[in-house]
Amino acid sequence: MSTATLDEARAAARSAGLAAGLRRVLARSTAVPCSAGGRAFLPAGWSGNVPAWHLPGGTLPRADARVRRHLHPLAGTCDLELVEVSPLVCTAVAPHDGPDFCPADELALLGVRIGTAERALDQATEHLAGRTSGGAPMIRYQLPRAAIADAVTELELCAAYRSCPADAHDRLCGVEQSIAGLFGGSGYLCAGPATSLYMAALVASTWTPVNGPGRWS
């Protein structure tokens, strides 16, 4: 199966945002993973393009799936939608009945999160350059500059974790929180400048296994 690479997804997310990065991954994916409850975040309007849904235990073809859209307070600000997927009939999803979510796609999702974080870091740098303290732009002070440098280093380390993307996804959570803090109080607002960071983490929580193989969020 052809899939977007980490670098391709990273570049798409950094240049055009979280939804653009996800579109790059999903355009060549055979199945979209869902959480244990059958929920997934997708680019708005994308659910009709999904060929199959990967639920814990097996894969559900589009023709056999019921897809419901749910309102989410933050998804729309990032051009995303929340869907809930279930079988059309009350039967168990047979294991190994279709293509699983490719490990390369999990790696590409890592690229989406890194690119989204880099985009937010670029915005945070501009934010600090436009604010003054003691008559000087905040970007000139040691603490903000050190925080930015640390974030850049951490993001490159996450990108280097290609053999273990699950560990990189865990590590990214701390980096995203650090970047959000660079915006000051606005970084903690709903629909604020750091919303894409929170949404990227939510997407990953439904797309990637947690607490070991076979266990999903």
Predicted features, each with a name:
Residues 149-158, 205-210:
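Short, charged low-complexity intrinsically disordered segments located at boundaries
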Residues 140, 144-147, 168-171, 194:
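Short, conserved alpha-helical segments within structured domains
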